[in-house]
Amino acid sequence: MKDPRDIIKRPIITENTMNLIGQKKYTFEVDVKANKTEVKDAVEKIFGVKVAKVNIMNYKGKFKRVGRYSGYTNRRRKAIVTLTPDSKEIELFEV
């Protein structure tokens, strides 16, 4: 099993994700190879909260070109973690 800090890369803090916090939904960028169970265990271990469900979205890399050199940006994976109603808040997202 991977270290939880290798699975959760960083929180995604945007206007849209801040609106979801009222519904106890938190958004993280996660490892591309991580599955829902690994993300759930990592969030519970790092933040000490109870997770109800995990939704995951995959983003493919964009085509970029600089002069005659071309390539793709790295692909990404985003997880929206929903906490149980009796779970405490994650302090990282407090404003």
From Swiss-Prot:
GO molecular function, one term: structural constituent of ribosome
UniProt xrefs under InterPro entries: Nucleotide-bd_a/b_plait_sf, Ribosomal_uL23-like, Ribosomal_uL23/eL15/eS24_sf, Ribosomal_uL23_CS
Keywords: Ribonucleoprotein, Ribosomal protein, RNA-binding, rRNA-binding
Segments traversing the membrane: none
Functional note: One of the early assembly proteins it binds 23S rRNA. One of the proteins that surrounds the polypeptide exit tunnel on the outside of the ribosome. Forms the main docking site for trigger factor binding to the ribosome.
Family: Belongs to the universal ribosomal protein uL23 family.
Quaternary structure, from the entry: Part of the 50S ribosomal subunit. Contacts protein L29, and trigger factor when it is bound to the ribosome.
Protein name, entry field: Large ribosomal subunit protein uL23
Any one annotated GO CC term: ribonucleoprotein complex
KW Cell membrane (keyword) present: no
SUPFAM superfamilies, sorted: Ribosomal proteins S24e, L23 and L15e (SSF54189)
Any one of the GO BP annotations: translation
Gene3D superfamilies: 3.30.70.330
Native source organism of the sequence: Geobacillus kaustophilus (strain HTA426)
